[in-house]
């Protein structure tokens, strides 16, 4: 569905980063666990990481900036952008803490699969969607937590400015710099691109895709969300390969048809099993419609790659009756999910998204992803593809044993797909659902076959 573009809030066809949603005014934290090399002091490690971080900010200066709101006024919330770090403020250097006595050893942490990692134990401020309370507000921070046998490196970025793809790319850049290398000129140009020009808005009067569902309704039509909690599941490479094979089974194999990706397949699997669990529990009826909202990386549509660190995510929605989801094959669900994702990942769609956001004077009216009913809907984002790249490492610290998104405030109905770190190929599935739903999901035969939770081993490949 399309409409005609209206004059944007800005006086030209450009505006800053597209992630202008109030809920994104917070931090995404990632933590990597590394061994401390023999005969290498903690002070030396701090100095090495600080040196690399300083060089990264020399080559990509806006990473040293603060996050600010500009152009606010009556009826206008303004928009979020970056500005130089105030000279009167303390420098935004690497911080560190020693927690040998208060935290498990590295070996214990690895054996537990990272189950001890929580935001409140690692950094002095929360992650999304909680208010951060930082003034000034840094674009990025690095914190080191030393434990017996190793160090936890916490890399955090402000989510209005840097998305998950950009955050993962920063791990690569830190490793390159710690190893004595340099960021390529092409990557530096991309990272420093004028973000207000990368995504030109659509001229007034031209057709634009309709994104009006991103405006918060008044009055709010849903009851308060149920109490939810995060739970981590793991999927081994054989399981993901089998699910991907099932998602491609019987689908169109013409050269022009794109096969289901691992993300498509895993999204279809989670949506199907959660819907089947909810249907079996009697909490929903088969004719109720469920929405799966997916975060879409808009870089390729705009001729960009992961070296463009700024936020470039939008959303797509797939809606189906719950009984249809539960009864469909993974191939059928994956095909529909892929079709909707491809429709969202076009230049016109991404530019329409930016044009719509620029035209909303009061950004507090924006609702990230639109209305989500936690009783029926799910939403997911993924950095799973990072597992196909070289393992995450940091110079003298070597390979990352595990990488995690530390546990924070619940986001009902949210799913994260992430690599686990190291070379195992294990994928993390982080789900936020009511406890009774998580417990029921763990008893679902399909879910039990393919996933591991709480130290329980998976069944093994199906013969």
Curated annotation (Swiss-Prot):
One of its GO terms (molecular function) is acyltransferase activity. Pfam families: TRI-like_N. O-acetyltransferase; part of the satratoxin SC1 cluster involved in the biosynthesis of satratoxins, trichothecene mycotoxins that are associated with human food poisonings. Satratoxins are suggested to be made by products of multiple gene clusters (SC1, SC2 and SC3) that encode 21 proteins in all, including polyketide synthases, acetyltransferases, and other enzymes expected to modify the trichothecene skeleton. SC1 encodes 10 proteins, SAT1 to SAT10. It comes from the Eukaryota. Pathway: Mycotoxin biosynthesis. This is O-acetyltransferase SAT5. The gene is SAT5. Gene3D superfamilies: Chloramphenicol acetyltransferase-like domain. Its EC number is 2.3.1.-. InterPro entries: CAT-like_dom_sf (IPR023213), Tri101-like_N (IPR054710). Trichothecenes are sesquiterpenoid toxins that act by inhibiting protein biosynthesis. It comes from Stachybotrys chartarum (strain CBS 109288 / IBT 7711) (Toxic black mold). Keywords: Acyltransferase, Transferase. Belongs to the trichothecene 3-O-acetyltransferase family.
């Amino acid at each position: 569905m399309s409409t005609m573009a209206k004059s944007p809030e800005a006086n030209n066809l450009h505006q800053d980063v597209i992630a202008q949603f109030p809920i994104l005014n917070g931090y995404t934290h990632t933590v990597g666990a590394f061994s401390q090399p023999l005969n290498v002091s903690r002070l030396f490690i701090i100095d090495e990481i600080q040196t690399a971080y300083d060089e990264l900010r020399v080559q990509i200066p806006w990473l040293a900036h603060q996050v600010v709101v500009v152009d606010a006024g009556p009826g206008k919330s303004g928009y979020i952008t970056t500005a130089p770090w105030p000279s009167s403020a303390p420098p935004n250097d690497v911080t560190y803490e020693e927690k040998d006595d208060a935290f498990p050893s590295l070996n214990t942490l690895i054996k537990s699969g990272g189950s001890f990692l929580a935001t409140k134990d690692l950094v002095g401020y929360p992650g999304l969607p909680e208010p951060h309370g930082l003034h000034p507000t840094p674009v990025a921070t690095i914190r080191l937590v030393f434990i017996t046998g190793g160090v936890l490196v916490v890399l955090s970025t402000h989510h209005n400015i840097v998305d998950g793809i950009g955050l993962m790319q920063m791990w690569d850049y830190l490793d390159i710099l710690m190893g004595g290398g340099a960021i390529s000129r092409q990557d530096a140009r991309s990272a420093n691109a004028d973000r207000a020009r990368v995504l030109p808005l659509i001229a007034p009067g031209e057709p634009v895709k309709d994104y009006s569902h991103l405006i918060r309704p008044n009055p709010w039509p849903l009851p308060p969300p149920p109490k939810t909690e995060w739970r981590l599941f793991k999927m081994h490479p054989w399981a993901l390969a089998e699910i991907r094979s099932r998602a491609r089974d019987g689908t169109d194999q013409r050269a022009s048809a794109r096969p289901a990706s691992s993300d498509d397949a895993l999204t279809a699997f989670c949506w199907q099993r959660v819907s089947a669990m909810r249907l079996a529990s009697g909490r929903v009826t088969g004719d109720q419609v469920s929405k799966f909202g997916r975060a879409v990386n808009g870089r390729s549509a705009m001729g960009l790659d992961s070296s463009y660190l700024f936020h470039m995510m939008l959303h797509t929605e797939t809606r189906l009756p719950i009984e249809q989801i539960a009864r469909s094959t993974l191939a059928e669900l994956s095909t529909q999910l892929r079709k909707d994702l491809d429709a969202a990942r076009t230049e016109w769609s991404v530019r329409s998204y930016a044009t719509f956001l620029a035209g909303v004077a009061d950004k507090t009216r924006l609702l990230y992803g639109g209305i989500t009913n936690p009783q029926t809907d799910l939403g997911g984002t993924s950095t799973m593809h990072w597992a196909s790249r070289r393992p995450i490492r940091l110079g003298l610290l070597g390979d990352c044993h595990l990488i995690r998104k530390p546990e924070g405030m619940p986001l009902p109905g949210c799913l994260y797909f992430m690599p686990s770190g190291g070379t195992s190929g294990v994928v993390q599935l982080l789900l936020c659902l009511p406890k009774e739903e998580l417990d029921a999901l763990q008893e679902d035969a399909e879910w039990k076959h393919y996933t591991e939770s709480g130290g329980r081993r998976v069944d093994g490949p199906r013969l």
